[in-house]
Curated annotation (Swiss-Prot):
UniProtKB keywords: Amino-acid biosynthesis, Aromatic amino acid biosynthesis, ATP-binding, Cytoplasm, Kinase, Magnesium, Metal-binding, Nucleotide-binding, Transferase
Pfam families: SKI (PF01202)
UniProt GO MF annotations: ATP binding; magnesium ion binding; shikimate kinase activity
Cofactor binding description: Binds 1 Mg(2+) ion per subunit.
Chain positions recorded as Mg(2+) binding sites: S16
Binding site for substrate: D34, R58, G80, R136
Family: Belongs to the shikimate kinase family.
Function: Catalyzes the specific phosphorylation of the 3-hydroxyl group of shikimic acid using ATP as a cosubstrate.
The protein, known as: Shikimate kinase
Record keyword ATP-binding present: yes
Low complexity bias: start-end ranges: 169-184
Location in or out of the cell: Cytoplasm
Length: 184
């Protein structure tokens, strides 16, 4: 058993929204690893970060992701930082991994004043977001088999594009404006 698609991307890229819609379109369930971590730990991610630190959170996250890659056959949505773990990156080999791309400005706008993202908490959110981008974008690109730009695109268009790629899994760098129906 393996997921139909694994979604990765920065906070605000649409992993939860696209994940729900993609799962519905495929007729499968969605597993959000952040929610699974909270359920397993009995605490919020922010609490885990505050009490145990990021290193312990990443250890738990890798455990949850590895199990989900074996046990879940629907759509799997990973937390934005999951790819920072070499173990997670290794576990993603051979899976269909969809990287939801987003600009810094759009990511900051979409995440707004959210308190559920510990690495973006506090002042200078735009600067923190750009730092996450520089660290994580190369990792997302390394693990992805499908890339889709989510900037200024409605979720339905993103899901349709992903569905077309799942039907034709040839390597991809980014949708063209004609394939996506949106200017890039």
């Amino acid at each position: 058993m393996a997921p139909k698609a694994v979604l990765v991307g920065l906070p605000g890229s649409g992993k939860s929204t696209i994940g729900r819609r993609l799962a519905k379109a495929l007729g499968v369930s969605l597993l959000d690893t952040d929610a699974a971590i909270e359920q397993q730990a009995g605490r919020s991610i922010a609490e885990i970060f505050a009490t145990d630190g990021e290193e312990e959170f990443r250890r738990i996250e890798e455990e949850v992701v590895r199990a989900a890659l074996v046990d879940h056959d629907g759509v799997l949505s990973l937390g934005g930082g999951a790819v920072t773990s070499p173990g997670v990156r290794s576990a993603l080999d051979g899976h269909t991994v969809v990287y939801l791309e987003i600009s810094a400005a759009e990511g900051v706008r979409r995440t707004g004043g959210s308190n559920v993202r510990p690495l973006l908490a506090g002042p200078d959110r735009a600067e923190k977001f750009r730092a996450l981008m520089s660290q994580r974008i190369p990792l997302y690109r390394r693990v992805s088999t499908i890339r889709v730009d989510t900037n200024r695109r409605n979720p339905g268009a993103v899901v349709r594009y992903i569905m077309s790629r799942l039907d034709d899994p040839t390597p991809n760098t980014s949708p063209s404006s004609t394939a996506s129906g949106a200017a890039t």
